[in-house]
C-alpha cells in the first residue's frame, strides 16, 4: 500500500537526538527515581586509525557490518572526548542572501520546499524566510533587514519574515560554509529554553502564536488581471460620517463602478478605523458619499481626514474561518498586491475569489501558514533534520590525544562503559594500550611501527613513544601464548616482557594498562573516514560532524 515517512518524522528524530544530551544521567549504584533517568545519551567523539588507507587521498566508504560497527572500530580507536549539550545543534543548509539571486517563496502546497532556497542568512547573521518573491520568482536586489516580528516588504517586492539571529557563540560552533544552526528558544510554557540568542527569537515565537493554526498570512498574485477599479483618498468634511457612510475624494475616476468593490480605511486620527471597512453598496457622484456593509462598530466611525483605499473585493473561502484581505494595485487596472487584514485560523485549504463587476483575469493563491504561525518553530519550518556535533580537540587534551601521529577516522560512540563496568563520565579518554618502559636499546619506536611482545606474541601498532618511557599502541591482536596477560585473557601483552619493534627498537617493560573504555561497550553511531589529519603540540582541530536524519 502507498505510504510515506514524512519530514516531521525526520525532524522529530533529530530533535530527540539533540534533546537527549540534556536528559538526566543514570549511573551505576544510583537509585532510579525517574524513568527519564535511563534516557540520557552519554556520547563521545573518538579518533582512530593511525595506519594508512590503501589510498590516503581517497578513503574508503565505511560499511555498516557487524564486524566493523561492533568490533573493528574499537581496535584502532586512539582517544575520545565527551560531547555536551552545548556541542550539539540542529542545523539547516546555508543559503546566503546575495543580490541578484532568485529565491523560492514559502508555499504550503509545495512538497519539495525543503529542497529549495526559501530562506536566507544575511551578512549580519539574521535568518529570514521568504514569504513572497515579487509574485513571479523575481530577482532579489534589496537585502532584508530588521529583527522585528512583522513581515518585511523590501523595495524589490519580496516579503520576508525574520526568524532569528545566529549569536556569535553559536556561529563559532555551528556555522560552516554549508550549514547554519537553527533552534527553538521557547518551551511549551513560554519560558526561554535557550538563552544564547537573547530575546529576538523569543519575541518572534510569541508573536507568531497570535496567528494561530492555519492562518492565511500571504496571498500570492498569480495573475494580475486587468480593468479593475482602484482608488485612494481621504474622508472629506461636508457629511456626517456614520458606521456605514462617508464623503470621499481623491480619485477623479470614482464612479458607480466602485459598487461591489471593497473600501478599507488606511489611517485615522484616533477613531481606530484603520484596517476596517466593508463592501461598497452605493455611491452618489453628486455628493461623493459612499455607503458600505456591514456596519462598523460605533466606536470606529471614520473621521474627516481618514485615509481609504478602494479595490476589487476578495473573499477567502475554505475549511477555516475569519480570513479578511484587500487588494491594492501597482499599475492601472491590475492587482499588485493583497494586504492581509486578518489571517483567520484553522484553514487547511483555501480559495481566493475576486468579486467585482469591473475587471477580469486576476488569479490569487492564498498561502496557509505553518502550525503556530510563521516563526513559531524555526526547526520545523526550515527543515531542521540535520544535526551538527562540534568538538574542539585542543592540543594533546591532557596527553590522551596524540600530537605525534595522525588519524584517519572520526566517530561517535554512545553509552560506553569504563573497563570496570561503570558508566564513562570523564571529559577525555585514552583508549590506547599503554606500556610503561623500564629500559630500551636507544632505538626509538616509530609511529605506526609494528611491535611484538616476546612472551605473549601479541602485536600492536605504535601511536606514540612519549618521553622514552611510555609506549602507546592500537590495533592490538592477541598472540598464541596461553598465559593470561594484563587483561586476564590468554595471549594478551604481559608486564615485564620485552617489546620489539619492526624497525629494531627493543624495550623491557614493567606494566601494561588497557584503554579507559571497556572494549566493545556502548554503540558506535557514526563513522567518517578521512584523509590523514596531522597533529602538532600547538594545534587545535575544530571537528564538525553532520548527521542527516
Predicted region positions:
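Short, solvent-exposed beta-strand-to-loop segments that form ligand-recognition rims
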Residues: 143-145
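Extended assembly-interface regions of large multimeric machines
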Residues: 1-138, 147-189, 402-437, 442-453, ...
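Conserved, function-critical positions that sit in or immediately flank catalytic
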Residues: 156-549
Amino acid at each position: 500500500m502507498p505510504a510515506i515517512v514524512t519530514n516531521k518524522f525526520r525532524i522529530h528524530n533529530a530533535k530527540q537526538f539533540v534533546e537527549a544530551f540534556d536528559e538526566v544521567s543514570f549511573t551505576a549504584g544510583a537509585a532510579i527515581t525517574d524513568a527519564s533517568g535511563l534516557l540520557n545519551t552519554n556520547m563521545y567523539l573518538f579518533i582512530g586509525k593511525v595506519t594508512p588507507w590503501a589510498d590516503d587521498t581517497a578513503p574508503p566508504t565505511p560499511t555498516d557490518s557487524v564486524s566493523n560497527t561492533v568490533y573493528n572500530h574499537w581496535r584502532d580507536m586512539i582517544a575520545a572526548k565527551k560531547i555536551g549539550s552545548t556541542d550539539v545543534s540542529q542545523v539547516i543548509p546555508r543559503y546566503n542572501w546575495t543580490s541578484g539571486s532568485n529565491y523560492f517563496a514559502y508555499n504550503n502546497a509545495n512538497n519539495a520546499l525543503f529542497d529549495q532556497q526559501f530562506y536566507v542568512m544575511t551578512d549580519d547573521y539574521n535568518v529570514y524566510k521568504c514569504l513572497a518573491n515579487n509574485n513571479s520568482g523575481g530577482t532579489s536586489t534589496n537585502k532584508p533587514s530588521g529583527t522585528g516580528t512583522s513581515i518585511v516588504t523590501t523595495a524589490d517586492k519580496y516579503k520576508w519574515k525574520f526568524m532569528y539571529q545566529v549569536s556569535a557563540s553559536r556561529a563559532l560552533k555551528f556555522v560552516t560554509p554549508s550549514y547554519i544552526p537553527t533552534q527553538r528558544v521557547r518551551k511549551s510554557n513560554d519560558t526561554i529554553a535557550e538563552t544564547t540568542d537573547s530575546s529576538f527569537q523569543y519575541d518572534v515565537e510569541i508573536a507568531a502564536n497570535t496567528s494561530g493554526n492555519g492562518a492565511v498570512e500571504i496571498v500570492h498574485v498569480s495573475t494580475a488581471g486587468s480593468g479593475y477599479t482602484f482608488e485612494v483618498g481621504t474622508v472629506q468634511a461636508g457629511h456626517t460620517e456614520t458606521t456605514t457612510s462617508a464623503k470621499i475624494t481623491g480619485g477623479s475616476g470614482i464612479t458607480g463602478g466602485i459598487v461591489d468593490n471593497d473600501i478599507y480605511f488606511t489611517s485615522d486620527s484616533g477613531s481606530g478605523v484603520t484596517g476596517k471597512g466593508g463592501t461598497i453598496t452605493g455611491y452618489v457622484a453628486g455628493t461623493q458619499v459612499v455607503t458600505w456593509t456591514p456596519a462598523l462598530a460605533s466606536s470606529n466611525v471614520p473621521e474627516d481626514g481618514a485615509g481609504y483605499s478602494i479595490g476589487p473585493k476578495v473573499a477567502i473561502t475554505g475549511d477555516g474561518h475569519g480570513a479578511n484581505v484587500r487588494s491594492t494595485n501597482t499599475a492601472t487596472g491590475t492587482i499588485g498586491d493583497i494586504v492581509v487584514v486578518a489571517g483567520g485560523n484553522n484553514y487547511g485549504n483555501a480559495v481566493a475569489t475576486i468579486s467585482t463587476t469591473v475587471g477580469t483575469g486576476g488569479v490569487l493563491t492564498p498561502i496557509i501558514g505553518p502550525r503556530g504561525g510563521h516563526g513559531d518553530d524555526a526547526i520545523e519550518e526550515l527543515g531542521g533534520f540535520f544535526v551538527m556535533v562540534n568538538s574542539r580537540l585542543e592540543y594533546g587534551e591532557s596527553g590522551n590525544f596524540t600530537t605525534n601521529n595522525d588519524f584517519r577516522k572520526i566517530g561517535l560512540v554512545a553509552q560506553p562503559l569504563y573497563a570496570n563496568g561503570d558508566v564513562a563520565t570523564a571529559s577525555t579518554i585514552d583508549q590506547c594500550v599503554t606500556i610503561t618502559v623500564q629500559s630500551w636499546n636507544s632505538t626509538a619506536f616509530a609511529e605506526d611501527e609494528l611491535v611484538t611482545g616476546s612472551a605473549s606474541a601479541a602485536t600492536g601498532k605504535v601511536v606514540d613513544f612519549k618521553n622514552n618511557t611510555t609506549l602507546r599502541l592500537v590495533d592490538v591482536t592477541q598472540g598464541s601464548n596461553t598465559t593470561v596477560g594484563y587483561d586476564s585473557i590468554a595471549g594478551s601483552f604481559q608486564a615485564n616482557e620485552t617489546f620489539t619493534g619492526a624497525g629494531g627498537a627493543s624495550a623491557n617493560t614493567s606494566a601494561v594498562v588497557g584503554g579507559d573504555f571497556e572494549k566493545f561497550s556502548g554503540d558506535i553511531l557514526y563513522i567518517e573516514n578521512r584523509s590523514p589529519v596531522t597533529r602538532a603540540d600547538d594545534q587545535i582541530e575544530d571537528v564538525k560532524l553532520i548527521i542527516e536524519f
